[in-house]
Every structure is written in C-alpha cells, then in structure tokens.
Regions:
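Conserved C-terminal RecA-like helicase domain
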Residues: 80, 95-104, 282, 286-364, ...
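Helicase-associated low-complexity/disordered flanking segments
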Residues: 1-49, 75-76, 232, 304-335
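SF2 helicase catalytic motif II
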Residues: 119, 123-127, 134-179
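Conserved nucleic-acid-binding Ia/Ib motif block in the N-terminal RecA-like helicase ATPase lobe
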Residues: 75-131, 192, 202
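Long, largely alpha-helical accessory region at the distal end of helicase-like NTP-driven motors
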Residues: 429-502
C-alpha cells in the first residue's frame, strides 16, 4: 500500500514522467501532490489504480491525466459516474478543458457525440456495454485505453453497488481502471480484489485534506463548537440534552425526543453572522428542500451589486430557456441568493444554480445528498439537517461514510483556510449523535453483488455455463468470504497443533 503525503517531491515528479506516459507538467500548470504523482507513475507502469482520498483532495486529477495521456496516444477514455447530473457536469467541464469535438455523453436518455475520444457515461451504461454482444466491425471498447470509475465507493450502495462490481469483473484486462474513491476502511482489500479479477493494480492512499474541517452544532441557543481541540470527542461546552422523566418518543422507539429543531432562518442567520457562507444545506427530501426555500421568507443574503449580477444572468437565461424558468417563488429566492438543487429540478435550471453558486452569487443551496456525489459546487460550509434518513427499507441513522461524504464538500481549495461543517439539532437527534458521526472512521466497502436473471442470461449468451459460473464467483463478496475462510483455517490449524501437544 502506498501512503501518500500532500507535498510534491522531485523524485515523485520524475517517476511520474517515466515509462510510456506523458509528463504531467505538460498537462497541469501547478505542482501536483505526491499521491497524484504516484498514481500517475503507476498508470505509466501499465497498472490500474485505486485512489482513496478525502472528498475535495484532488482525486479527479488522476482521471484527467489518464484522459490527456490517452489523447496523446490517439486512444479513448470512458469516464463513468454514478449520476446523470454528474455526467452532465463532467460533459460541460471536459468540453471546456479538452474541446467540444473530443467529448461525448451517454446516459439512459441522451446520446451526444458517442464516437468521441472521451465519453462520459453513467456506470450502468458501461456495465450494459460490457454485456452487449460486440459486433466484429463495431466494438464500443475498441481503442479504449482507460476507464475512470468516479465515486467508486458507490459499490456500497445497497441498490446499485452491484453495477460497479460487474463493471470491474467484466472489463477487459488490457483496459486500465482508474477507481476514484472517497476514504474507505478497506481500500487495500478492494485493490487486491481488482488485481485478482482484472490485473496489476496499485493502491494510492492519502488522508490529507487541503482545507481542514471545523465541526459545529446549532441548537435553538445558537451555534457552538461540536468537538474538542483534539477532535476526538465532544467539546466541553456541549451538553447532552436529557428528556424529563416520563417523556417518550411517539411511535415504536423508546428513545426520548430531543428539543425542537431551530428554524432554518435562525441557522442561516447564525452562519451569516460568522461569515460561514456560501453553504450547501443537505436535506433528505426534495419537498423539504423546496419548502426550506420558502421558509427563509424575505431573508436576503446578497449585496445590491451581487443582486444586479444575478438579475442580468437570470434575464439572459430566461430569454434562452423560457420553458425552464421555475415559478415566482424560486426566481425571487434566487435574487436573494437562495436556491434548491435536487433531481426534481429541470437540468437547465440546475446548471444555472451551479453556475451562480460557483461564482459565489448563491449563498445557500438546499440540496438532497446527491449533491455530495462529486458535483462541482464547492462551498465554505455544509449543513446536515438530520442525522438519519428514510430509505426504501425504513428509517435508519446515517452511516459514517455518508456523513463524511457530505461534510467533505466544505472548504474550497485555494479560497478557504477552513471548511465548516454544521450539524443541526433535530427533534430526535442531538449533540451526542452528531459527535459520534463526526469522530467515526470511514465504513468498509462490502459486496452488494446480486446475480439477477438478466445477468445470468447475458453471461450465457456470451459464455459457456462453466465460464458464466466462474465469472459470477469472482465477486468482491466471494473474495471477502475467502479472506474470512483463511483466518478460520489458520485458527483451526493452531487448535489442532495445541491438541496434538496435549
């Protein structure tokens, strides 16, 4: 395992330029961090790479280098993402970076310039491509040098994680994989598994955050530090609220209720007073995101000059996209530096919000957690409104990795010396739960591989029964189970040895 440090070194830079690769100094006009250079060096040695690093640390640059190198070789790159919104943003970013003619897009409902050298797509599209019967004269994987798996930690998603496993298992070995993941507890196991099922793979790990995070807690009494100076536990001034005797939570849980949550307008005002805006305010419901925009009432977060700039951009947008302008409440809120961003918003309106937020003209955007998935909307602060969420399998607490992914959106590299993460008192979760999540380690990746009838039919169309069975048995879950079996066998061997000595 490679443990990377944040500062670039001459030795690492020289190594990265070696082999059949492209000198990174020809691609980027700024010094690279060591972990980026080490990943580039591994790619130039012909290895696939797993890059595990905190959100906002610069992992995407490794994927961008793979693109520059493929273009220099006259080859292609597929860049996969978990979300259509992220694919659309990558299309815009890469067009600006590499030229319109070089970039295409494939999602479930859109196909743009699919023969381009760089094709951005959702991971499901890539998986389906691997299952499709390749035409002798039209192989979609021909000339593909590398596949970038952005947000690879989505392997943990209970509904969609299997797509990432299937993509890795079935990707042809000559194609290099660039797996970009947020910090996970078992990145070494992921790397070892990819090496077994795909080919030589190098793990690059960095735990360095370019912009450190400060955790705060907001209750009806105000905004206060959440953690102690060491960041290992609750701040001495944080008091865990205890319900009066006899007060019970309604419903099935016996957990006592917490104090009422502070109004959103109060939370935003507290942050504005401390110069903690712009902020992404995470709320796990589209309806409540829109409601929160209305709940801020007439609160204005922008100056007259900023308002004039928003007005000019909104007028130009309205002229070009009259059908995409949201109702009067949302347009009015936009003029005050407030917006909602979620899957129910038209893509063109979301693009406008992203543009204005990147320019610092929107001060608070209420968003569902999909915005934590790498969409380029860097903020000074993130606010996490609830420490539990409703899922298809019922209500559950946030996982540590989910919390860290949202928290990691705070802090803009090159703009902020500090990023701020604000957790908010809710009716049933308070400072204790916030402290536990803020100090919890990253979760390990687990296998979500689920052989479906469709998968089996796809495999049998292309392979014999024995080969199809062998491919299904390559899953990450089977690999992890094998590790447990090795440990059990070692324990049995030790017990047998002890018995023989009695």
């Amino acid at each position: 395992m490679t443990k990377a440090q944040p500062e670039p070194s001459t030795q690492a830079s020289d190594a990265a330029a070696s082999g059949s690769g492209l000198d990174p100094s020809h691609c980027f006009a700024f010094p690279l961090d060591d972990f980026q250079l080490e990943a580039i060096d591994a790619l130039n040695q012909g290895h696939s790479v797993v890059v595990s690093a905190p959100t906002g640390s610069g992992k995407t640059l490794v994927g961008e280098y793979a693109i520059y190198r493929a273009l220099a070789h006259g080859q292609k790159v597929f860049y996969t993402t978990p979300l259509k919104a992220l694919s659309n943003q990558k299309l815009r970013d890469f067009r600006e970076q590499f030229g319109d003619e070089n970039v295409g897009l494939l999602t479930g409902d859109l196909s743009v310039n699919r023969e381009a050298s760089i094709v951005v797509m959702t991971t499901e599209i890539f998986r389906n491509m691997l299952y499709a019967e390749a035409d002798e004269h039209d192989d979609p994987l021909a000339d593909v040098e590398a596949v970038v798996l952005d947000e690879c930690h989505y392997m943990n998603d209970s509904q969609r994680g299997t797509v990432w496993e299937e993509s890795i298992i079935h990707c042809p070995p000559p194609i290099q994989l660039v797996a970009l993941s947020a910090t996970v507890a078992n990145a070494g196991q992921l790397t070892d598994w990819i090496e077994k099922v795909h080919g030589p793979t190098t793990l690059i790990v960095s735990d360095h955050r370019p912009v450190p995070l400060q955790f705060s807690f907001c209750s009806a009494k105000g905004l206060h530090p959440l953690l102690n100076e060491a960041g290992t536990g609750l701040h001495p001034n944080c008091k865990v609220w205890r319900a009066p005797k006899g007060q019970k939570r309604k419903g099935r849980s016996n957990k006592p209720p917490q104090p009422e949550a502070p109004p959103i307008s109060f939370v935003v005002a507290q942050m504005a007073q401390r110069d903690m805006l712009p902020a992404i305010y995470f709320i796990f419901s589209r309806r409540n995101c829109d409601k929160s925009v209305r709940d801020l009432g007439a609160q204005c977060l922008v100056s007259q000059d900023e308002q004039a700039r928003i007005q000019a951009r909104l007028a130009a947008y309205s002229a070009a996209n009259p059908e995409a302008v949201r109702d009067g409440i949302h347009a009015d809120a936009l003029m005050r530096g407030i917006a909602a961003h979620h899957a129910g918003v038209l893509p063109a309106w979301k693009e406008l919000i992203e543009e204005l937020f990147q320019q610092g003209l929107i001060k608070v955007v209420f968003a569902t957690e999909t915005l934590a998935a790498g969409i380029n909307m860097p903020a000074r602060s993130t606010v996490i409104a609830s420490l539990s969420k409703r899922t298809e399998r019922g209500h559950r607490p946030l996982m540590g990795s989910e919390f860290l992914q949202m928290a990691g959106r705070a802090g803009r590299r090159g703009l902020d010396s500090q990023g701020y993460v604000v957790t908010v008192q809710s009716r049933f979760e308070g400072v204790r739960e916030a402290g536990q999540l803020a100090t919890s380690p990253a979760d390990p990746l687990v296998s979500q591989f689920t052989p479906s009838y469709g998968m089996v039919l796809n495999l049998l169309q292309r392979h014999s029964l024995d080969k199809a069975r062998e491919l299904v048995q390559r899953s990450f879950g089977r690999y992890l189970a094998g590790l447990d079996l090795v440990d059990d066998e070692e324990m049995l061997s030790q017990l047998r040895l002890q018995l023989s000595q009695l």
